[in-house]
Amino acid sequence: MRKSRKSTGRWLNEGDAVIIFRNTGQVINHARILDRKFRIETPDLGTIAVDTDSIMSIVFKNLPTYPTDVLRTLGGTELNGTILNDLIRVKAQDLGGTVEIRKAKIISIIW
């Protein structure tokens, strides 16, 4: 008998993420983001802290396509502004364990 699976709204399973680097296009698969929350400063709502478990993707400022950072939640909300987490803690076997990556080096994180 086949088990039914409920969609989580995420592309990857088990909390894994894909990190795409800005200048090189390098991709890290099966990364675990260790930050529990991401804080984003928005022009309309002020500073908001969003649980990492509720985030579907983050695209960091990339002119001209993305004039601000964009955080998308599993609920469909899109927040535009500045992500305040400068260092992002990541655990990935391919990186040799736990590392900190500056947000300026990352173009996007997709869960």
Q: What do these predicted ranges mean?
A:
Residues M1-W111:
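Compositionally biased alpha-helical segments
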